[in-house]
């Protein structure tokens, strides 16, 4: 399998803690309902799953934000719940209600039926990865992704989204043995799923631990972090084109546990808007020439409802909090990938996204010029 040479490797360089000409930027849920063209494609598809399971539609919507904005990476259009759906739990999306499973996993009998699914059931995802990679034609890298074992378990036990996670936490505290069995199966399934995306052409992969932050200290390490670690240990390090595949881990609400996550076998840690970027850089970013993690994030998505000049000011503030960029191309050092602290809201005005992208690219170039690189 061969693909066009990569023209913009800024995102991948930042993942590897290599110096870049500017701070790369992409957005969680960048292909989504805030774009009118997405809504038009979604209407043609007839349903969310009709969109996600159709290779042509998934390719089309993945590329839509790149046609509008000079983003530095594309991310596969899919859903984190495709894996438990392939386990036979019956995923559906009711209009205005979000995802729902027809079958839930709350007792020993249900857990006994769980197994790592046949990846052929997810062939539509891998075919979409290859299709998107070809359609990108080397423009920017493609990110594959999955939900974390814990986050998938939340939906599998609750049956849908939750405000208090009462059912999954009840199982966790009353039958930790069952929860560990669910999480072990999930971890092995997620690893197989991400490896298949890598084989299909993904150039980086991301684990979304969207609900890790709802756990108590101690429970996070036991029920979330340990199983993210199990996923990472199984991931392929090299993509189909022979280059390394950076691994990104994002735990929403995880700033409390940065020192724990420092030990994860991944290249990038994603941060939500509650994290202090300067503190995160000091804790896990590493020094020039030494080991460390690249950092991704972390502007509040609701900033995008402010006027463009306020958006630009907030973007500059995030960049300034990370601090002076690493500029020595002869070695590695602290790097920053600009992103939101969580997914973009469906109500976001697209022109406000344009203002954000312009501000990030412009200010980050100016920061490097001020640092004396002469490459602004």
From Swiss-Prot:
Signal peptide positions (record): none
Alphabetized PROSITE patterns for the sequence: UROD_1, UROD_2
Entry's localization field: Cytoplasm
Top-rank EC class of the record's enzyme: lyase
Keywords: Cytoplasm, Decarboxylase, Lyase, Porphyrin biosynthesis
Record pathway: Porphyrin-containing compound metabolism; protoporphyrin-IX biosynthesis; coproporphyrinogen-III from 5-aminolevulinate: step 4/4
Annotated GO biological process: protoporphyrinogen IX biosynthetic process from glutamate
EC identifiers of the protein: 4.1.1.37
Site keyed Transition state stabilizer: positions: 79
Gene Ontology cellular component annotations, sorted alphabetically: cytosol
Residues annotated for substrate binding in this entry: 29-33, 79, 155, 210, 342
Catalytic activity: uroporphyrinogen III + 4 H(+) = coproporphyrinogen III + 4 CO2
Gene Ontology molecular function, alphabetical: uroporphyrinogen decarboxylase activity
SUPFAM superfamilies the UniProt entry points to: UROD/MetE-like
Predominant location category: cytoplasm
Role according to the record: Catalyzes the decarboxylation of four acetate groups of uroporphyrinogen-III to yield coproporphyrinogen-III.
Assembly with partners or alone: Homodimer.
HAMAP family assigned: URO_D
NCBIfam families: hemE
Protein name, UniProt field: Uroporphyrinogen decarboxylase
